[in-house]
UniProtKB/Swiss-Prot annotation:
Top-level taxon: Bacteria
Task of the protein: Reversibly transfers an adenylyl group from ATP to 4'-phosphopantetheine, yielding dephospho-CoA (dPCoA) and pyrophosphate.
E.C. code: 2.7.7.3
Pfam families assigned to the protein according to its UniProt record, in alphabetical order: CTP_transf_like
Gene giving rise to this polypeptide: coaD
BP terms from Gene Ontology: coenzyme A biosynthetic process
Source organism of this protein record: Bradyrhizobium sp. (strain ORS 278)
Family statement drawn from the similarity comment of this UniProt entry: Belongs to the bacterial CoaD family.
Molecular-function GO terms, alphabetical: ATP binding; pantetheine-phosphate adenylyltransferase activity
Name this protein carries in UniProt: Phosphopantetheine adenylyltransferase
EC category name: transferase
Binding, ATP: S10, F11, H18, G94, L95, R96, E104, V129, R130, P131, I132, T133, A134, S135
Assembly mode: Homohexamer.
Pathway participation: Cofactor biosynthesis; coenzyme A biosynthesis; CoA from (R)-pantothenate: step 4/5
């Protein structure tokens, strides 16, 4: 049986924190699906297509190097439903700190009730990327700050262009 894992998020933009989670997750599964959430009530900085392209460009080579199949797709329903539809048995969630853990434990409990066959796997962020959040990265970029420490090289120019 193929171990399929779903890693959901907005990825607006892809950050080094996301990359850190993917680097760990590809060793836990045979196929990793990065699921880009589409929330109709929110206006992301990057379009859905741009976020999917970033995911493929940044995460695809990492998965390939680890011998893990990779795909990126979108979803606009419950994350647990997206995981079921993808055939996932694992849901990957990154943790930066205790606040994340408290929130993620609630989600994991609700998801387990709705889909007992899907196990949530918490991946702790490596120390250098723990403070990174996509919202802080967007704020820094909007104010002309240096973002290259927080996002993969291929994301720097597109992110700066959004605020040019």
């Amino acid at each position: 049986m193929q171990r399929i894992a779903l890693y959901p998020g907005s990825f607006d933009p892809v950050t080094n924190g996301h990359l850190d989670v993917v680097r760990q997750a590809v060793h836990l599964c045979d196929k990793l699906i990065v699921a880009v959430g589409v929330h109709h009530g929110k206006k992301p900085l990057f379009s859905t297509e741009e976020r999917l392209a970033m995911a493929h460009e940044v995460f695809g080579p990492v998965a390939s190097a680890a011998g893990c199949a990779f795909d990126a797709s979108t979803y606009d329903n419950l994350t647990v439903t997206a995981a079921q539809q993808a055939g996932a048995i694992l849901m990957i969630r990154g943790l930066r700190d205790g606040t994340d853990l408290d929130y993620e434990m609630q989600l994991a409990g609700m998801n387990q009730t709705m889909a007992p066959s899907i196990q949530t796997v918490f991946v702790p962020a490596s120390v250098p990327v723990r403070p990174i959040t996509a919202s802080l990265v967007r704020q820094i970029a909007a104010m002309g700050g240096e973002i290259s420490h927080f996002v993969p090289p291929s994301v720097v120019a597109p992110l700066k262009a959004k605020f040019a």
